[in-house]
Amino acid sequence: MDSLTQKLTVLIAVLELLVALLRLIDLLK
């Protein structure tokens, strides 16, 4: 796996985590 693919995978994982956090915060409001 080249570094670009690895960076994209990490970026997508981080974005999914952020979305999950935003949904949690929205539910807690």
Swiss-Prot record:
Top-level taxon of the source organism: Bacteria
Membrane topology category: Single-pass membrane protein
Keywords for the protein's UniProt record, in alphabetical order: Membrane, Transmembrane, Transmembrane helix
GO CC terms in record: membrane
Residues that span the membrane, as ranges: 10-27
Annotated localization: Membrane
Expression induction or repression: Expressed during exponential growth in rich medium and at lower levels in exponential and stationary phase in minimal medium (zorO mRNA cannot be distinguished from zorP mRNA by these assays as they are practically identical).
Role according to the record: Toxic component of a type I toxin-antitoxin (TA) system. Overexpression leads to cell stasis and a decrease in colony-forming units. Probably repressed by cognate small RNA orzP. Base pairing occurs between 18 bases in the 5' UTR of zorP mRNA and the 5' end of OrzP sRNA.
Listed name of the protein: Small toxic protein ZorP
Native organism: Escherichia coli O157:H7
Protein encoded by which gene: zorP
